[in-house]
A protein has these predicted regions:
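Acidic/histidine-rich helix-loop elements
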Residues: 1-9, 102-103, 166-177
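Gly/Ser-rich "nucleophile elbow"/oxyanion-hole loop immediately N-terminal to the catalytic nucleophile
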Residues: 1-42
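Primarily recognizes the serine-hydrolase "nucleophile elbow" in alpha/beta-hydrolase
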Residues: 25-27, 32-79, 90
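Acidic catalytic loop of the alpha/beta-hydrolase fold
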Residues: 89-92, 162-164
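Alpha/beta-hydrolase-fold serine-hydrolase catalytic core, especially in secreted/extracellular enzymes
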Residues: 79, 116-198
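Soluble non-cytosolic domains of exported or imported proteins
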Residues: 7-15, 41, 52, 105-109, ...
Length: 198
């Protein structure tokens, strides 16, 4: 969607995901009120784009290591958003004062700015998070009083690079088992469902 081959070839990744959702709904017995988005790196940015563009479809987002690169859509309706990001990320920098990818759009903001942008989009109360839950290896900053009963959260991993997961993948080391990021994401997502119109 945003970078590398898909971006260069202008592939319709959002259309593909929506088609997959439509086929799964048509062919399987699923709870349509609990269709969630998640992804890592470009997949996180795509998850946030889908939330922005098609908020009527998805119940919540919890993704890892990237930001929303688009402007808010006028027809966006608030849904819960969580982004999980390693403080030591050298690919998509936490602060994004600079970036190692040739994508100028990604230099607009970092993890904190992404949190604040979603808080504004979700009509959250206050200019700063009203919840801060620090622990030894990570912290969770959240806006909890938002439109549609939503929340917006940023999980900051103190000792993680671009890969926030426990296990290493390819050339990206994991967090060494210090933080169960999958568990954090699922605990967030599973709290939310969406009212489905008949």
């Amino acid at each position: 969607y945003c970078c590398s081959t898909a971006g260069e070839m202008q592939l319709n990744d959002t259309g593909l995901i929506l088609e997959i959702v439509d086929r799964v709904v048509a062919n399987h017995s699923i709870d349509e009120s609990r269709i969630y988005l998640t992804g890592w790196s470009n997949g996180c940015s795509l998850s946030q784009k889908l939330a922005n563009d098609h908020s009527e479809v998805f119940a919540a987002v919890a993704c890892m290591s990237y930001y929303l690169l688009d402007d808010p859509r006028p027809d966006y309706s608030p849904i819960p958003i969580m982004e999980i990001h390693g403080l030591e990320d050298q690919i998509i920098l936490y602060s994004n004062d600079a970036i190692h990818l040739p994508n100028l759009d990604a230099q607009k903001h970092g993890a904190i700015q992404n949190l604040l942008q979603w808080a504004e989009m979700n009509g959250c109360e206050g200019k700063s998070p009203d919840s801060n839950s620090p622990s030894v290896f990570y912290s969770v900053q959240s806006f909890t009083n938002c439109a549609n009963g939503t929340e917006v959260s940023l999980v900051t991993l103190y000792a993680a690079d671009h890969n926030p997961y426990e296990e290493s993948y390819d050339v990206f080391p994991g967090n060494g088992g210090t933080v169960d990021t999958n568990g954090i994401a699922w605990a967030f997502l599973s709290r939310f469902s969406k009212a489905i119109e008949p």
